[in-house]
Amino acid sequence: MNGASRQTEFPLDSKVFTGTFTIESVYAYEFSTPTDHTVVGSTAIGRHNEVQITHLGVGGDFHWKGARGRIMTQLGMYSTMTPRNDASPGRGQWSLDNAYRYITEGYGGYHFDVDHGLNIDAGIFLSYVGLCSYYNYENWTDQASYVSSNTPCFFNGVRIQYFPSDKLKIEPWIINGWQSYGEFNEMPGLGVQIQYRPYGWLAFVFNQYVGKDTLGNADRVRIHTDDSVLVKYHENPASFLSRGAFSVTVDVGCETGGGTSCWGGDSSSPSQYFAGFMAYNRFWFLNNTVGFTFGGGAMTNPGRYLVLTPPINGATAFSGTPYFPQAPGTDYKAWDATLTLDYMPSQFITFRGEYTHRQANVPYFAGHNGVTPPGGNQGSPGSTVTLPGGAVWTPDLQKAEDRLMFAIFVRI
C-alpha cells in the first residue's frame, strides 16, 4: 500500500544483521526553467534540469536476543534539504543539523515477547505522519501532496510499539519536537500512531500530536491530527488490470496561545491553523509490473507555520526570509495534482516518470530568474540583498509550478 515497501525478499539477511541498500536518482525539469536551478517548496526534489542523487541509504537492522538497532545513512540532496527545514538547531550550540544530517534512521532498543510484540526504541525514527514514506521507493508518487510533504518525516526521541494483535499497532512517541533534532522550548512533543488493518484490503492510520514548536515562544501550543484510510478494491493477477487501490488522508491542526488562536481570531490574536487533504488512486497492470497513479490534494495554512520556507538567498526554517513572511496573520492556500507512471520489473527496482502541477494563492514557486541573488548568496542566510547602486534585489516567485521528473529507485 501507499507508504509501505513491496519487498518480500531480503538477500542481505543473516542471523544478526539484515542489510539494506537504497538509492533514489532523479532528473527533474521545471517548466519555469529557473536560472539558478533551484526548486522551491519540495521535500522530494531540489534541483532543476540536473540528475541528482536525492537519497542514498546504506545500513540495516541489527537483531540479537531481543536487542535491536537500525542505522540508515542520509547521503545526497536530503542531507541538506531535510536539516534546513528544522529551526531547532538555532537554539544553543553544537550544530545539531550537522550532527544528524547524514542519518535517516538511527535508533536502538529492545523487543519484548508481549502479546504480538512490544518494542521500545530511542533515537531518530521515521514518523509516517502524512501517510507517505520518506523513501519514495515505497510511495505511489514522488511529489507527495502538502499534508505529507509539509508534515514530519522523522522524529528524535522515544517510541513504544505495542502490537496487541496481528491487526493493530499502538505507537506512542515522546520526542524533542515536530520534525526537530532538538527542543524548541521546554516541553517535549507528545504523539501517538494507531494503525489498524482489519482485513488485507483495508487499513486505517491515525496520528495525533501536541507540542510547543515555535522557537522562542513557550506559550504557543501546536495540535495536529493526521488520519488516513487505504482500500484495495481489486486483485486479480491473471487479468491485465491486476490490482487497484486508493488512499485518502485528512489533516487538521492549529496553534493557540502566544499571540495566536485556533479559530475565530482577531487582529491581536489571529487564527492560525492547518487544514488539508490528499487522495490518490493507483492501478497496477501486467501482474503488478506497471503502476499508474493519479491524484492530488489541497491545504490552507493561515500563519504559514507549516509552509516550507523558500530557500531565498540561502534562507532556512531558522533564518526565515523577509521576502516570504511566516507570521500570524499571513495567508497561504495551495493545491496540487500528479500523474505517475512506474515500471517495476522486480521488487528491487522502480523506473518512474511523473508530472506535477502545483498552485498557490500567493507567489511561492521559483520563476525563471530564480531565488538566488546575482553572484550567489549574500550576507547572512535569508537577509535582504542590496545590489550595487542601491537597488534592492527581489526573488522571482510565481503562483504556479509545473514539473516533470524521471527517476530510478533501487532497494536491496
Can you annotate each of these PLM segments?
Residues 12-16, 51-53, 187:
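Short, surface-exposed loop/turn motifs at beta-strand boundaries within globular domains
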Residues 45, 82, 91-96, 202-210, ...:
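Outer-membrane beta-barrel pore domains
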Residues 57-78, 83, 161-171, 228-233, ...:
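Surface-exposed extracellular loop regions of Gram-negative outer-membrane beta-barrel proteins
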Residues 30-48, 80-107, 111-196, 203-212, ...:
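Surface-exposed coil loops of outer-membrane beta-barrel proteins
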Residues 1-38, 389, 407, 412:
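N-terminal periplasmic/intermembrane-space "pro-region" immediately following the signal or transit peptide
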Residues 21, 53-62, 105-110, 122, ...:
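Residues on the lipid-exposed face of transmembrane beta-strands in outer-membrane beta-barrel proteins
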Residues 4-19, 61, 65-70, 113-118, ...:
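Short loop/turn motifs that connect adjacent beta-strands in outer-membrane beta-barrel proteins
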Residues 25-33, 55-57, 64-68, 75-79, ...:
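Transmembrane beta-strands of outer-membrane beta-barrel pores
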